[in-house]
């Protein structure tokens, strides 16, 4: 769903420049989906793990036939890139709010993986940012776009089921293995812990989003 519709920043003959933050999970799947549109170009990738970054850059080149122009460990450099129109936020959940707001402040539209934020407060901040900076922000709730879900909801709302008295909901939690807890060890080669632990000026990034 769209939080706020903003104005397009590219001309009729231009491609939409996309940058991905967080390349090792759903974010890259989102990027591949975007790249199916011939009017989209991947401008930059960002990940704190250099190994992941290089692997995804190679995969993207294989898909598009072009080298990715910019590779960043620090996601803030991707946000600052003037050639990027749209930012895909595919990082772990606790990063979504800061990165989405920063992208909006930089005048970029955003596709953010679910969940939107870690709290209602974060979500409210993100909605206000989309409104304040007049940006298009879509959350990866893909089920809302699938016709069979829309048809089912339309059928329920039509009243053909009569008065609904009971709703049962289940959540299948066992499909993904849990992340193992590992003992302290040396920083893996290629991982930038300084970016991973960046929090000191996070409040400044959200300043002014009333």
Locate predicted features.
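N-terminal glycine-/serine-/threonine-rich beta1-alpha1-beta2 phosphate-ribose binding loop
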Residues: 1-112, 121-136
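A short, local hydrophobic-aromatic micro-motif
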Residues: 41-43, 69, 162-165, 194
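Proline-centered helix-kink/hinge sites
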Residues: 91-92, 115, 202-203
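Active-site-proximal cap/lid insertion segments
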Residues: 106, 187, 200
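A contiguous active-site-proximal alpha/beta segment in oxidoreductase catalytic domains
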Residues: 109-111, 117-190
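Conserved small/polar residues in nucleotide/adenosyl-binding loops
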Residues: 195-205
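Hydrophobic alpha-helical segments, chiefly the membrane-spanning helices
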Residues: 209-210
């Amino acid at each position: 769903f769209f939080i706020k519709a903003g104005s397009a920043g590219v001309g009729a003959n231009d491609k939409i420049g996309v940058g991905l933050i967080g390349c090792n999970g759903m974010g890259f799947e989102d990027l591949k989906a975007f790249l199916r549109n011939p009017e989209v170009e991947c401008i930059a990738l960002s990940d704190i793990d250099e190994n992941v970054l290089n692997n995804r850059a190679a995969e993207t080149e294989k898909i598009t036939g072009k080298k990715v122009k910019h590779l960043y460990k620090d996601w803030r450099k991707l946000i600052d890139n003037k050639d990027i129109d749209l930012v895909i936020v595919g990082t772990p959940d606790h990063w979504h709010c800061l990165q989405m707001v920063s992208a909006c402040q930089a005048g970029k539209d955003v596709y953010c993986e679910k969940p939107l934020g870690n709290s209602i407060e974060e979500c409210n901040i993100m909605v206000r940012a989309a409104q304040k900076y007049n940006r298009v922000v879509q959350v990866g709730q893909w089920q809302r776009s699938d016709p069979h879900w829309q048809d089912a909801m339309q059928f329920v709302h039509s009243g053909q089921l009569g008065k609904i008295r009971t709703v049962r909901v289940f959540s299948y939690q066992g499909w993904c293995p849990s992340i193992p807890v590992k003992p302290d060890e040396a920083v893996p080669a290629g991982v930038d812990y300084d970016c991973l632990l960046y929090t000191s000026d996070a409040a400044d990034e959200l300043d002014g989003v009333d």
